[in-house]
Amino acid sequence: MTDNESLKSSISNRSTSFIRNTSTKPRTDSFIFPNGDRYDGEYTVTEEAQIMRHGQGKHTSADQQLIYEGTWKNDKMHGTGRLIYGNGTSYDGEFQSNYFEGLGTYAWPDGGQYTGLWKGSKPIGKAEYTGPKLGVPFVGIANGQQTHMRYKVSSL
């Protein structure tokens, strides 16, 4: 299972029908869902009495393997936020409907990081990669499947 698939599973694999007071006004609270996930932040409640994360909030999976802190829209990561995986990798940037979308930085625990544009959680367009211990960044173009990088040359 990929990181994005496990995130979707964690976020959608829950039931919140225990809320009965419906209102479209945003509220702030903390919840522990039946699957053990925790959410702290803003939300609304649908007419069907379902919690919809909406606004600023933090979602932590029960096993602590996924943590998202940022903006939510209609129960999806949407806007600016930070997603941290249990293996130490992270993504800081823009989200749209649970996907990396727009400008963002994906970082690995060894210090490497990839900064560029994303679409559908795939890198596209101009990007820069800085590897751990390399000291010299690479720049290049990504098309969602392959990334072509070269050393970044600085003028003196």
Placement of each model-derived feature along the sequence:
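Intrinsically disordered, low-complexity repeat tracts enriched in Gly/Pro/Ser/Thr and acidic residues
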Residues: 1-156
